[in-house]
Regions:
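Structured alpha/beta or helical-core interaction and ligand-binding surfaces enriched in interleaved
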Residues: 22, 29-35, 41, 47, ...
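Exposed alpha-helical structural elements
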Residues: 6, 31-34, 86
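Acidic, low-complexity, intrinsically disordered interaction modules
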Residues: 44-89
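Short secondary-structure junctions
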Residues: 39-45, 96-99
Length: 109
């Protein structure tokens, strides 16, 4: 299976936000971490992400986010590792009060 198909399969684990006009996917915390592990294997950079909360059947931003800019002297591998590390640290350390109702919008890649 090629890389794009593998990415598409991973994204299906999340909730598409396309109907809300957002070209991205929301994942539960544990699923987001699993996707990050697989993205690292596929060499997919993570540029950042946002936290969305499911409220009354609608995803709403809570305006918490993270980002990772590439350094000018960074190799692809260095940036990959650092971008995944920053994403994982944010997600693992993020305190979600309502775990089942909260989603982390992950992928700006």
């Amino acid at each position: 299976m090629n890389k794009l198909k593998q990415i598409d399969e991973l994204l299906k684990k999340g909730h598409s936000l396309h109907e809300a006009g957002i070209n991205n996917w929301a994942f539960l915390k544990k699923d987001a971490l699993e996707v990050l592990n697989r993205f690292e294997e596929l060499n997919v950079f993570i540029l950042g992400g946002d936290v969305y909360v499911l409220s009354y059947d609608f995803f709403q931003p809570n305006y918490d986010d993270w980002y990772c800019n590439r350094f000018s002297n960074e190799t692809d591998i260095e940036f990959l590792k650092r971008s995944i590390k920053i994403a994982k640290e944010f997600i693992m350390n993020y305190n979600i009060a309502y775990t089942e109702a909260s989603q982390i919008l992950l992928l700006s890649y």
